[in-house]
UniProtKB/Swiss-Prot annotation:
One of its GO terms (molecular function) is NADH:ubiquinone reductase (non-electrogenic) activity. Binds 1 [4Fe-4S] cluster. Belongs to the complex I 20 kDa subunit family. It comes from Wolbachia pipientis subsp. Culex pipiens (strain wPip). The gene is nuoB. Its main location: membrane. It is a peripheral membrane protein. It catalyses: a quinone + NADH + 5 H(+)(in) = a quinol + NAD(+) + 4 H(+)(out). GO terms for cellular component: plasma membrane; respiratory chain complex I. Its cofactor is [4Fe-4S] cluster. Its EC number is 7.1.1.-. This is NADH-quinone oxidoreductase subunit B. It is an enzyme of class 7 (translocase). HAMAP family: NDH1_NuoB (MF_01356).
């Protein structure tokens, strides 16, 4: 004999930190907790936003304490940070690098230029947002966005991963 909970009750108890007893939910919780605590981003710096991205790795913000360690190879990374103006010629390279990443893969669009073309929106050679080339999970606004904004975006990505339901 047991207690039957509706979906709403089950989700409420799970959010409040009660022990999860369904085996599938337990496995999902553990996998998502591990994934969110060890993000390995690869930088795809194209303009001035890449300089601000370097600040987040410095001692003041220290992304390492959140388990975020930058990688140089797309085969080792699970997050790609697109920072700066994406031109039409670089779009194919962006897609190729994205395809080389292992699943599950996430994309963070950093800055106004990567989000929607920014200052160069009406230029013939600029892609109006990297979401036209790769699927984007988190948008970080600003021109250029501050290191705090990127840090907040990475924390939002961690929360999104924790909420993900695995199949």
């Amino acid at each position: 004999m047991g207690i039957n909970l509706s979906n709403g009750d089950w989700n409420r108890y799970k959010k409040e930190g009660f022990l999860i007893t369904k085996f599938g939910d337990l496995i999902d919780y553990i996998m998502n907790w591990a994934r969110s605590g060890s993000l390995w981003p690869m930088t795809f710096g194209l303009a001035c936003c890449a300089v601000e991205m370097m600040h987040t790795a410095s001692s003041r913000y220290d992304l390492d304490r959140y388990g975020i360690i930058f990688r140089a190879s797309p085969r080792q990374a699970d997050v790609m940070i697109v920072a700066g103006t994406l031109t039409n010629k670089m779009a194919a390279a962006l897609r190729k690098v994205y395809d080389q990443m292992a699943d599950p893969k996430y994309v963070v669009s950093m800055g106004s230029c990567a989000n929607g073309g920014g200052y160069y929106h009406y230029s013939y050679s600029v892609v109006r947002g990297c979401d036209r080339i790769v699927p984007v999970d988190v948008y970080v606004p600003g021109c250029p966005p501050t290191a705090e904004a990127l840090l907040y975006g990475m924390l939002c990505l961690q929360n999104k991963i924790k909420r993900t339901k695995n199949i």
